[in-house]
């Protein structure tokens, strides 16, 4: 988009004074949208013209084969743009381009078996050239920062020639970060 209708009201400096968030979780029950990513805030190098465009990623939570998943790309893009307009995030005339990407199994499904993770990790670590990174690689609820951190740790290990992957598996194990079931 050319610009957002949201402006930076914080003391944090951002390019073009856009909101400083990398992602915004949507709590509006009147829309299906789950999360907005603002790629300009991940890195200005991810955006071709960061001074006069804002690149957004929109996440919709659905299941492979459901109505939303099967929606035609053009229809889905129009649906998403309409939701952003409804929420006041953008104006229709600011939309420059759009692309839809379906990501299978983007979020791991957490079912039975977690009591065996230690054994699974021990087994997987026997393969020197296998590095488990990100949500699906570690079958763990990592946010984007944690997922990227597992990749960075993996690169460090490969460059240094170490085969101890403890540092990779230790990303996002801080107890105070995790939500508890009540």
List each model region and its residues.
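FAD/FMN-dependent oxidoreductases across multiple families
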Residues: 18-20, 31-45, 93-130
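C-terminal lid/capping helical subdomain adjacent to the catalytic/cofactor pocket in oxidative enzymes
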Residues: 101, 111-182
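Mid-domain catalytic core of redox enzymes
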Residues: 1-74, 78-88, 123, 166-176
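Short Gly/Pro-enriched loop/turn and capping motifs at secondary-structure junctions
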Residues: 63-65, 105-106, 137-139
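A short, terminal or domain-edge coil/loop segment
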Residues: 76-94, 144-161
